[in-house]
Amino acid sequence: MEKVSFSKISVGDEIPELVKKVTLIDLLQYAAATWNFFLTHIDKEFAQKQGFQQVNIPAAYFGACLTKLVSDWIKDPGQIKKLGYRVIRMSFVDDTLKFKGKVSKKYQEAGQNLVDCELWVENQDGVQVATATATVSVLG
């Protein structure tokens, strides 16, 4: 995939989606990388004792995947200037999550080419489980 350039971006352009079937191994690796070993994110029996149907996906995992979605799209030397997200529904191990986005605004400010993006995450049933926004800078 070629690098994104400001001149070729249009409002409404879709960001290539990132699809992840989240496995227990993914969550264990994420726990190790972030030192977040809260048991509802890695132990099914503990999660069920806490009232969850299954091991649940930590909210910060969404942030990591949304960052990957955007950075894979803009590539180096593009930069993520701002990213904010909100998880609105629980997601669980073995869910398939689709990280999606589109360009909502394109502008120049302080000598930078900036692009605002609307982002969201859907589960395997097409239900939105997270929303997000990002601002990125890209070359001409």
What function would you assign to each model-found segment?
Residues 1-15, 91-140:
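HotDog/MaoC-like acyl-thioester-processing domains
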Residues 40-46, 80-82, 110-111, 123-128:
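Glycine-rich loops and low-complexity Gly/Arg-rich segments
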Residues 72-95:
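Mid-chain, well-packed structural core segment of small domains
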